[in-house]
Design a protein with these regions (language model features):
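His/Asp/Glu-rich, glycine-adjacent segments
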Residues: 1-119, 214, 223, 259
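Structural recognition of the beta-strand scaffold that forms the well-ordered cores
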Residues: 18-23, 103-107, 154-156, 203-205, ...
Length: 300
Protein backbone atom coordinates (compact mmCIF):
# COMPACT_ATOMS: atom_id res chain seq x y z
CA UNK A 1 0.00 0.00 0.00
CA UNK A 2 3.07 2.28 0.00
CA UNK A 3 3.11 2.28 -3.81
CA UNK A 4 0.77 4.75 -5.52
CA UNK A 5 1.51 3.79 -9.14
CA UNK A 6 2.47 0.52 -10.88
CA UNK A 7 6.19 -0.26 -10.90
CA UNK A 8 8.12 -1.77 -13.78
CA UNK A 9 7.78 -5.10 -11.95
CA UNK A 10 3.97 -4.81 -12.02
CA UNK A 11 4.10 -4.09 -15.74
CA UNK A 12 6.38 -7.09 -16.33
CA UNK A 13 4.06 -9.39 -14.37
CA UNK A 14 1.06 -8.18 -16.38
CA UNK A 15 2.90 -9.32 -19.51
CA UNK A 16 3.45 -12.77 -18.01
CA UNK A 17 7.18 -12.26 -17.47
CA UNK A 18 9.19 -13.87 -14.67
CA UNK A 19 10.36 -11.35 -12.06
CA UNK A 20 12.86 -11.52 -9.20
CA UNK A 21 14.03 -9.22 -6.40
CA UNK A 22 17.02 -10.33 -4.35
CA UNK A 23 16.45 -7.95 -2.62
CA UNK A 24 14.56 -4.79 -3.58
CA UNK A 25 13.00 -1.90 -1.59
CA UNK A 26 9.23 -1.76 -1.04
CA UNK A 27 8.81 -5.30 -2.28
CA UNK A 28 6.76 -7.14 0.39
CA UNK A 29 3.72 -8.80 -1.23
CA UNK A 30 4.92 -7.39 -4.55
CA UNK A 31 4.72 -8.84 -8.08
CA UNK A 32 7.65 -11.24 -7.83
CA UNK A 33 8.13 -14.91 -8.66
CA UNK A 34 11.35 -14.89 -6.60
CA UNK A 35 11.62 -12.50 -3.67
CA UNK A 36 13.93 -11.79 -0.77
CA UNK A 37 12.20 -8.69 0.63
CA UNK A 38 14.15 -5.70 1.87
CA UNK A 39 12.61 -5.50 5.33
CA UNK A 40 13.74 -5.07 8.93
CA UNK A 41 12.14 -4.38 12.32
CA UNK A 42 10.96 -0.80 12.86
CA UNK A 43 9.81 -0.58 16.46
CA UNK A 44 11.04 -3.71 18.23
CA UNK A 45 14.84 -3.97 18.19
CA UNK A 46 14.58 -7.53 19.52
CA UNK A 47 12.48 -8.66 16.56
CA UNK A 48 14.33 -10.90 14.11
CA UNK A 49 15.10 -9.52 10.66
CA UNK A 50 15.53 -13.08 9.44
CA UNK A 51 12.08 -14.08 10.68
CA UNK A 52 10.51 -11.09 8.94
CA UNK A 53 12.18 -12.10 5.68
CA UNK A 54 10.99 -15.68 6.13
CA UNK A 55 7.40 -14.46 6.45
CA UNK A 56 7.49 -12.77 3.05
CA UNK A 57 10.00 -14.57 0.80
CA UNK A 58 8.80 -16.09 -2.46
CA UNK A 59 8.50 -18.93 -3.12
CA UNK A 60 7.81 -19.68 0.56
CA UNK A 61 10.76 -21.25 2.40
CA UNK A 62 13.28 -19.89 -0.10
CA UNK A 63 15.67 -18.87 2.71
CA UNK A 64 15.46 -22.41 4.12
CA UNK A 65 16.15 -23.83 0.67
CA UNK A 66 19.38 -21.87 0.35
CA UNK A 67 20.40 -22.59 3.95
CA UNK A 68 19.89 -26.33 3.47
CA UNK A 69 21.21 -26.89 -0.05
CA UNK A 70 24.06 -24.38 -0.13
CA UNK A 71 26.56 -22.65 2.11
CA UNK A 72 24.24 -19.73 2.83
CA UNK A 73 24.83 -18.25 6.27
CA UNK A 74 21.31 -17.95 7.72
CA UNK A 75 22.15 -16.66 11.20
CA UNK A 76 20.70 -13.39 12.49
CA UNK A 77 24.21 -11.90 12.32
CA UNK A 78 24.22 -12.54 8.58
CA UNK A 79 21.52 -9.89 8.05
CA UNK A 80 24.07 -7.09 8.58
CA UNK A 81 27.36 -5.92 7.12
CA UNK A 82 29.34 -7.56 4.36
CA UNK A 83 27.85 -10.98 5.10
CA UNK A 84 24.37 -9.71 4.20
CA UNK A 85 25.55 -8.65 0.75
CA UNK A 86 27.46 -11.91 0.27
CA UNK A 87 24.34 -13.91 1.12
CA UNK A 88 22.14 -11.88 -1.21
CA UNK A 89 24.74 -12.11 -3.98
CA UNK A 90 24.73 -15.89 -3.65
CA UNK A 91 20.92 -15.96 -3.85
CA UNK A 92 20.88 -13.61 -6.84
CA UNK A 93 23.39 -15.71 -8.79
CA UNK A 94 21.55 -18.94 -8.07
CA UNK A 95 18.14 -17.56 -9.08
CA UNK A 96 19.58 -15.98 -12.22
CA UNK A 97 21.47 -19.12 -13.21
CA UNK A 98 18.55 -21.51 -12.66
CA UNK A 99 15.60 -19.38 -13.80
CA UNK A 100 16.90 -16.53 -15.99
CA UNK A 101 14.14 -14.11 -14.90
CA UNK A 102 13.05 -11.56 -17.46
CA UNK A 103 13.45 -8.73 -14.91
CA UNK A 104 15.59 -8.83 -11.76
CA UNK A 105 16.17 -6.21 -9.09
CA UNK A 106 19.31 -6.63 -7.01
CA UNK A 107 20.34 -4.17 -4.28
CA UNK A 108 23.85 -3.99 -2.75
CA UNK A 109 23.72 -2.42 0.73
CA UNK A 110 27.28 -1.68 1.84
CA UNK A 111 27.95 1.65 0.07
CA UNK A 112 24.83 3.21 1.61
CA UNK A 113 25.51 1.76 5.06
CA UNK A 114 29.12 2.98 5.06
CA UNK A 115 28.20 6.51 3.98
CA UNK A 116 25.49 6.78 6.64
CA UNK A 117 28.07 5.83 9.26
CA UNK A 118 31.15 7.68 8.04
CA UNK A 119 30.02 10.35 5.59
CA UNK A 120 30.91 10.63 1.92
CA UNK A 121 34.71 10.39 2.08
CA UNK A 122 36.23 7.77 4.32
CA UNK A 123 38.41 4.70 3.89
CA UNK A 124 35.47 2.49 4.89
CA UNK A 125 33.35 4.07 2.14
CA UNK A 126 36.04 3.42 -0.46
CA UNK A 127 36.27 -0.15 0.82
CA UNK A 128 32.48 -0.52 0.47
CA UNK A 129 32.50 0.70 -3.13
CA UNK A 130 35.39 -1.60 -4.05
CA UNK A 131 33.41 -4.47 -2.52
CA UNK A 132 30.29 -3.49 -4.49
CA UNK A 133 32.38 -3.20 -7.64
CA UNK A 134 33.59 -6.78 -7.17
CA UNK A 135 29.97 -7.99 -6.88
CA UNK A 136 28.97 -6.14 -10.05
CA UNK A 137 31.99 -7.67 -11.78
CA UNK A 138 30.80 -11.11 -10.72
CA UNK A 139 27.37 -10.36 -12.22
CA UNK A 140 29.02 -9.39 -15.52
CA UNK A 141 31.05 -12.60 -15.44
CA UNK A 142 27.90 -14.66 -14.77
CA UNK A 143 26.06 -13.13 -17.74
CA UNK A 144 29.10 -13.86 -19.90
CA UNK A 145 29.39 -17.44 -18.64
CA UNK A 146 25.72 -18.11 -19.45
CA UNK A 147 26.02 -16.50 -22.92
CA UNK A 148 23.15 -14.15 -22.07
CA UNK A 149 24.49 -10.83 -23.36
CA UNK A 150 22.41 -11.00 -26.58
CA UNK A 151 19.32 -11.10 -24.32
CA UNK A 152 20.41 -9.02 -21.31
CA UNK A 153 20.49 -5.31 -20.45
CA UNK A 154 22.46 -4.56 -17.27
CA UNK A 155 21.78 -1.26 -15.48
CA UNK A 156 23.92 -0.26 -12.49
CA UNK A 157 22.63 2.80 -10.67
CA UNK A 158 21.82 4.31 -7.29
CA UNK A 159 18.70 5.99 -5.94
CA UNK A 160 20.51 8.90 -4.26
CA UNK A 161 23.83 10.36 -3.20
CA UNK A 162 24.84 11.40 0.32
CA UNK A 163 25.34 14.70 2.14
CA UNK A 164 27.68 14.95 5.13
CA UNK A 165 26.25 16.14 8.43
CA UNK A 166 27.65 16.95 11.87
CA UNK A 167 24.39 17.34 13.84
CA UNK A 168 21.05 15.54 14.10
CA UNK A 169 17.89 17.57 14.71
CA UNK A 170 15.30 15.46 16.53
CA UNK A 171 12.18 17.38 15.57
CA UNK A 172 9.67 15.19 17.38
CA UNK A 173 11.71 15.53 20.57
CA UNK A 174 11.34 19.30 20.16
CA UNK A 175 7.59 19.02 19.48
CA UNK A 176 7.27 16.81 22.56
CA UNK A 177 9.18 19.35 24.67
CA UNK A 178 6.78 22.10 23.53
CA UNK A 179 3.66 20.04 24.29
CA UNK A 180 2.67 19.39 20.68
CA UNK A 181 2.91 15.61 20.93
CA UNK A 182 3.01 12.96 23.64
CA UNK A 183 5.32 9.97 23.91
CA UNK A 184 4.92 6.61 25.61
CA UNK A 185 6.49 3.14 25.40
CA UNK A 186 9.11 4.43 22.97
CA UNK A 187 6.60 5.80 20.46
CA UNK A 188 4.30 8.73 19.74
CA UNK A 189 0.91 8.30 21.44
CA UNK A 190 -0.86 11.52 20.42
CA UNK A 191 -0.04 14.70 18.58
CA UNK A 192 -1.15 18.16 17.51
CA UNK A 193 1.86 18.44 15.21
CA UNK A 194 4.21 15.66 14.12
CA UNK A 195 7.29 15.43 11.92
CA UNK A 196 8.08 12.71 9.38
CA UNK A 197 11.86 13.08 8.99
CA UNK A 198 13.73 11.77 5.95
CA UNK A 199 17.27 12.92 6.68
CA UNK A 200 17.64 15.98 4.50
CA UNK A 201 14.00 17.00 4.86
CA UNK A 202 11.10 16.67 7.26
CA UNK A 203 7.38 16.78 6.53
CA UNK A 204 5.28 18.45 9.23
CA UNK A 205 1.63 17.47 9.69
CA UNK A 206 -0.96 19.30 11.81
CA UNK A 207 -3.83 17.30 13.26
CA UNK A 208 -6.11 20.31 12.81
CA UNK A 209 -4.75 22.37 9.89
CA UNK A 210 -7.59 24.89 10.18
CA UNK A 211 -6.49 25.89 13.70
CA UNK A 212 -4.68 29.15 12.89
CA UNK A 213 -3.35 29.49 16.43
CA UNK A 214 -1.72 26.04 16.33
CA UNK A 215 -0.36 26.69 12.85
CA UNK A 216 1.25 29.94 13.97
CA UNK A 217 2.65 28.16 17.03
CA UNK A 218 4.45 25.67 14.78
CA UNK A 219 5.69 28.42 12.46
CA UNK A 220 7.13 30.36 15.40
CA UNK A 221 8.84 27.22 16.65
CA UNK A 222 10.44 26.14 13.37
CA UNK A 223 11.07 29.20 11.18
CA UNK A 224 14.37 31.09 10.89
CA UNK A 225 16.49 28.31 12.38
CA UNK A 226 20.13 27.74 11.42
CA UNK A 227 19.40 24.07 10.89
CA UNK A 228 16.44 24.23 8.51
CA UNK A 229 14.40 26.21 5.99
CA UNK A 230 10.65 26.13 6.65
CA UNK A 231 8.37 26.02 3.60
CA UNK A 232 4.57 26.00 3.47
CA UNK A 233 3.43 22.65 2.09
CA UNK A 234 1.22 24.42 -0.46
CA UNK A 235 4.30 26.22 -1.84
CA UNK A 236 6.24 23.03 -2.49
CA UNK A 237 6.53 21.80 -6.12
CA UNK A 238 4.76 18.51 -6.82
CA UNK A 239 8.10 16.84 -7.54
CA UNK A 240 9.30 17.54 -3.98
CA UNK A 241 6.23 16.41 -2.06
CA UNK A 242 6.35 13.28 0.09
CA UNK A 243 4.30 11.51 2.76
CA UNK A 244 1.13 12.75 1.05
CA UNK A 245 0.02 16.33 1.62
CA UNK A 246 1.96 18.01 4.42
CA UNK A 247 1.33 21.35 6.09
CA UNK A 248 5.00 22.34 6.18
CA UNK A 249 8.30 21.05 4.89
CA UNK A 250 11.69 21.63 6.49
CA UNK A 251 14.77 21.40 4.27
CA UNK A 252 17.95 20.75 6.25
CA UNK A 253 20.73 23.29 5.98
CA UNK A 254 24.29 22.13 5.24
CA UNK A 255 25.67 19.97 8.03
CA UNK A 256 22.32 19.06 9.58
CA UNK A 257 20.20 15.91 9.42
CA UNK A 258 16.61 15.34 10.56
CA UNK A 259 16.36 12.24 12.75
CA UNK A 260 13.37 10.25 13.97
CA UNK A 261 14.76 9.80 17.49
CA UNK A 262 12.48 10.95 20.31
CA UNK A 263 15.17 11.37 22.98
CA UNK A 264 16.50 14.70 24.19
CA UNK A 265 18.49 16.72 23.46
CA UNK A 266 16.75 17.61 20.22
CA UNK A 267 20.02 19.09 18.88
CA UNK A 268 22.39 16.12 18.98
CA UNK A 269 26.00 16.10 17.70
CA UNK A 270 26.24 13.18 15.28
CA UNK A 271 28.50 12.98 12.23
CA UNK A 272 27.80 10.83 9.21
CA UNK A 273 25.98 10.96 5.89
CA UNK A 274 22.35 11.27 4.92
CA UNK A 275 19.92 11.80 2.06
CA UNK A 276 16.21 12.41 1.57
CA UNK A 277 16.57 16.15 1.00
CA UNK A 278 16.19 18.46 -1.99
CA UNK A 279 17.06 16.34 -5.05
CA UNK A 280 18.43 19.47 -6.73
CA UNK A 281 21.38 19.33 -4.32
CA UNK A 282 24.33 18.25 -6.51
CA UNK A 283 25.69 16.01 -3.73
CA UNK A 284 22.53 13.91 -3.91
CA UNK A 285 23.09 13.07 -7.56
CA UNK A 286 24.00 9.48 -8.33
CA UNK A 287 25.37 7.61 -11.33
CA UNK A 288 23.95 5.32 -13.98
CA UNK A 289 25.79 2.79 -16.12
CA UNK A 290 24.10 0.60 -18.71
CA UNK A 291 25.43 -2.08 -21.02
CA UNK A 292 24.19 -4.99 -23.07
CA UNK A 293 21.15 -5.46 -25.27
CA UNK A 294 19.72 -2.21 -26.65
CA UNK A 295 22.53 -0.01 -25.29
CA UNK A 296 24.72 1.95 -27.72
CA UNK A 297 28.25 2.63 -26.52
CA UNK A 298 28.80 6.25 -25.54
CA UNK A 299 25.14 7.26 -26.03
CA UNK A 300 23.31 9.39 -23.48
Amino acid sequence: DSLKVPTVFHLAQEKGLVTAATPWPVSVNGPFDYLIPEIEPVWDEKESTLELVRQHDQPPMMIEYFAFFSDLNSSEESTQGFQRDLNLHHIFKTVFRKSLPHLTGYHIFRPDDAQHTHGRRHDRVREAFLFADSLVGAVIDLITELNQWPHTTLIVTGDHGHVDHHTDIRLNALLHEKGLLTVGNGGITNWKAVAHPSGGAAFIHLKNPSDDSERQNVVSLLENKEWGQLIEGSDLPETLKGYGESDFVLLAEDGYNFSGDLDQPFVYPHSGGGHGGDPNNPQLKTTLFAMGRGIRSGAI
